[in-house]
Amino acid sequence: MQKTTLIQILATSTILLSALSVHAESDGNRGYVGRNANGCKGLPSYEQLKSALVSAVAADSTGFNLNMWATIVDRDGVVCAVAFSGADRGSQWPGSRVISAQKANTANAFSLDGLALSTANLYSAVQGTSDASPLGGSLYGLQFSNPVDTAVAYGGNPAAVGTKFDPMVGNRVGGINVFGGGLALYNSSKKVVGALGLSGDTSCADHNQAWLVRKNLGLDNLAGIGGVSGDATRPDNIVYDSINGNSNNITDGWEQPICANTSNPTSLPAVK
C-alpha cells in the first residue's frame, strides 16, 4: 500500500511539474525580473530617461505645452523604463502611458539596422480606402496586429506607474500605434537597440519631443541609415504634406496630418 501511494504521489508531482512547464512556455511574456534580466541593461536607466524627458518638454513649445509620458523598450520589446515629466502621474493624460509604450513597441518592431521608421511615418500607409485614396494604404491592417497585452498594460499597483517600479517594466506590452511619437534607438555602432515612445500632447509635439529625448540620450546615431522622410540627415523624421511632403493636398505616402501649432520638421536637430 505504501509503495502504491508513493508511486501515485510521484506520478501526480510529475504531471504538476509538466503543467507548470507548459504554462511557463505558453506565457513567455511573464517572469522577467525588472530591467536587469534582459536587454535593458545596455539602455538608459529610469533616471536618465526622466532627465532627458523633462529637458525635452521644457525645450519644445509646439502643441499645447502639456506634460508627457515616455517609455523605452529593448530590442525584444521588453519595457525597460517608464517616466513622466509632470509633478505626479496625474499631471499628464493617464491614457498616454500605454500609448507611449505602444509607440516604443511599434518603432522597435518595424525598424532595422538599415531602415529607421518612426510611428509618424506609418500613418498614411495604414489608412483604409477613401475618396482621396481609393486603393487605401499599402500597410492597411498593420494597426490591428500585435495587440497590447492588457495584463501588462493595466496590471500592478497604480501608485507605481511612471516610477522606477512601473508594473510594465520587465514585460512585453506589445501594441501598435501609427502617429507621431515613436522612434527607434541607435547606438554608436549604428545598430538599433530598442525604441522610445512619447505621448501626452499633439502627435506632432510627441514626435518633436521624442526626437529631442533621443538626442539627449545619445541614441540618435543613424546618419546614413535608410528612411522614408526624404532627408538623409533626419531619416525617420515626420513628414507633412504641405511642409516637407508631396504638396498634393492629400495625406499620403509616408505623411501624417499637421497638428495645432505645428513646426517645420527640418528645424529638428540632424542625427549623428
Region locations from a protein language model:
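N-terminal signal peptide c-region/cleavage motif recognized by signal peptidases
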Residues: A19-H23
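Bacterial N-terminal signal peptides
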Residues: L10-S18
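Flexible, solvent-exposed loop/hinge segments and secondary-structure transition points
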Residues: E25-K272
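Hydrophobic alpha-helical context, especially transmembrane and signal-peptide helices
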Residues: T4-T5, I15, A132
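Bacterial N-terminal signal peptides that target proteins for export
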Residues: M1-L10
